[in-house]
Curated annotation (Swiss-Prot):
SUPFAM superfamilies: Translation proteins (SSF50447). The keyword Ribonucleoprotein applies. The lineage of its organism: Bacteria, Pseudomonadati, Planctomycetota, Planctomycetia, Pirellulales. This is Large ribosomal subunit protein uL3. Residues 157-176 are annotated as: Disordered. It comes from Rhodopirellula baltica (strain DSM 10527 / NCIMB 13988 / SH1). InterPro entries: Ribosomal_uL3 (IPR000597), Ribosomal_uL3_bac/org-type (IPR019927), Ribosomal_uL3_CS (IPR019926), Transl_B-barrel_sf (IPR009000). PROSITE patterns: RIBOSOMAL_L3. Belongs to the universal ribosomal protein uL3 family. HAMAP family: Ribosomal_uL3_B (MF_01325_B). GO terms for molecular function: rRNA binding; structural constituent of ribosome. Part of the 50S ribosomal subunit. Forms a cluster with proteins L14 and L19. GO terms for biological process: translation. It comes from the Bacteria. One of its GO terms (cellular component) is cytosolic large ribosomal subunit.
Amino acid sequence: MSPSILGRKIGMTQIFLEDGTAVPVTVVQAGPCHVLQVRSKDRDGYEAVQMGFEDKPRRLAKRSERGQVATIESKRSKKRSAAGIEAPAKADCEPQRFVREFRGSSEANVGDTLTVEQFNDVKKVDITGTSKGRGFAGVMKRHNFAGQRATHGVKKCHRHAGGTGMSASPSRTFKGKRMAGQYGNAKVTTRNLEVVRVDAENNLLMIRGAVPGPNGGFVSIRQTNKVG
């Protein structure tokens, strides 16, 4: 599996290169991440690594989230161990807020911790996040329509889309016609972004350009598979 990690977008700033060039970068807190499960082809039909980022208090976690990590010693677990029943291996950590799977074979084991150091030799990455939700937006904002004339011949329709249908034939609106509607709050992947700096001490990645989502939003980072 190519180097992959989960993180949280912090915000944008600029840093200076050795030649004095100012570079706009997005700072991402990347890891540390706990390996929760390792998928295998024999058992699951595909190979992948499931990892989690950022601890979540057990009292706030759902049962499904608590089930992904090792349980605190309870009466039930003591009875099982006394009966010789072995539970599957689970990560010895708190429930995780952000959990994702990355496809591919890996040498990682359940309970391992993945850090940002794996990106020391990586130059380009793909970043996936949830874009900012903008609510119900018109066609000029959502689809970059030019709008109608600002003056002559237009009454209160300056930002309208105009006609959407046809005449007598086919007498309907085609599917996929671009109209006003929900904009944003969707899964977005920005590809081939340059890694400018890796701060392993503070678990930070500095990436040239914009990263999808608001400040504080969760993101998935993976080495790009694009060539060139």
